[in-house]
């Protein structure tokens, strides 16, 4: 069955607009995806007709808002096949989720002389929190190097593990290269050494089904805004037994059981003890609508369509004169490139003149830029609403830029 891309595009109002007098070709979904009417309407309806502060309210609006929020927790748990909804913490996004793990689990479990393993392709959100933790604790940060094609040098991984390895923190899919890492093999190796595993799923959950039980990871984190949902909301999954042992990392309302000026404070049970303060309830409602939306289309069908479009894009871009493509042939979501010796910002600015939106810069992956020896790259990302015609416009735009700039 053909993927209904035109029907999907009709659900995204922003795709009807023009930029510089030309139809918008939005090729920046890896930074943040656009939102369908279903998400916009769900969040708007909540604020129009159902808004109230959640927790402890005895009135109808508060009770209904609380129920709606907890229903999204259950929905998200089914989406990633968690064993229980109580294994999911609402966070602002992937970055906060990783920082929560570093500051809660990490503070309790990392000691001087321990080590944490990451890779050279990580987003800063999966580098900096571990650097900060290691510096604070006197631990070591070890790095899996890359092959030139943008895949991990897995032959070096076993040697990085030892009896002081406490955590493997790895991206599911690179936000620059599109590399999908072989998580089952990597997690199995971590298990041999008794290490925990955190997976940054920010660039994975919108492209194919994720099953955290099958992966057997300890932590999995993703953001709503890359999944066609609102900004400011994400999900941190933690295995229940592990989550119950973790102390809170932020204090305030909603995360307590009792507070006494003389006897101290006791915490709420997990996951609520990790959700201090008033939550982003509207964002949570929007996230639920986004999960509904992609589920109704079928992640398998979305993935098949995106892979077909990716193959076409790689074939066509390879024909652009003087282009350098980064990353493996088999990839998800993104294509990073440079055009001759022209700076990525210049190329991106020209493309914007043609109504084409791409991301330029270091993509919050400065160590990866250093490995490739470039200050920046252009990145085109492909989502379920992109088309062959938009790829053709990108190719034509780059060819024109090459002719203009030489």
UniProtKB/Swiss-Prot annotation:
Gene3D superfamilies listed in its UniProt record: Aspartate Aminotransferase, domain 1, Type I PLP-dependent aspartate aminotransferase-like (Major domain)
CDD domains: SufS_like
Active site: 364
Pathway: Cofactor biosynthesis; iron-sulfur cluster biosynthesis
Catalytic activity: (sulfur carrier)-H + L-cysteine = (sulfur carrier)-SH + L-alanine; L-selenocysteine + AH2 = hydrogenselenide + L-alanine + A + H(+)
Known EC number: 2.8.1.7, 4.4.1.16
Cofactor(s) recorded in Swiss-Prot or TrEMBL: pyridoxal 5'-phosphate
Keywords: Cytoplasm, Lyase, Pyridoxal phosphate, Transferase
Gene Ontology terms: biological process: cysteine metabolic process
Residues bearing the modification N6-(pyridoxal phosphate)lysine: 226
Cellular localization per UniProt: Cytoplasm
Any one GO molecular-function label of the UniProt entry: cysteine desulfurase activity
GO CC entries: cytoplasm
Chief localization: cytoplasm
InterPro entries xref list: Aminotrans_V_dom (IPR000192), Aminotrans_V_PyrdxlP_BS (IPR020578), Cys_dSase_SufS (IPR010970), PyrdxlP-dep_Trfase (IPR015424), PyrdxlP-dep_Trfase_major (IPR015421), PyrdxlP-dep_Trfase_small (IPR015422)
One family name in Pfam for this protein: Aminotran_5
NCBIfam families: PRK09295.1 (NF006791), sufS (TIGR01979)
Assembly behavior: Homodimer. Interacts with SufE and the SufBCD complex composed of SufB, SufC and SufD. The interaction with SufE is required to mediate the direct transfer of the sulfur atom from the S-sulfanylcysteine.
Role noted for this protein: Cysteine desulfurases mobilize the sulfur from L-cysteine to yield L-alanine, an essential step in sulfur metabolism for biosynthesis of a variety of sulfur-containing biomolecules. Component of the suf operon, which is activated and required under specific conditions such as oxidative stress and iron limitation. Acts as a potent selenocysteine lyase in vitro, that mobilizes selenium from L-selenocysteine. Selenocysteine lyase activity is however unsure in vivo.
Assigned protein family: Belongs to the class-V pyridoxal-phosphate-dependent aminotransferase family. Csd subfamily.
PANTHER family listed in its UniProt record: CYSTEINE DESULFURASE (PTHR43586:SF25)
Protein name stated in the entry: Cysteine desulfurase
Organism: Salmonella choleraesuis (strain SC-B67)
Higher taxonomy: Bacteria, Pseudomonadati, Pseudomonadota, Gammaproteobacteria, Enterobacterales
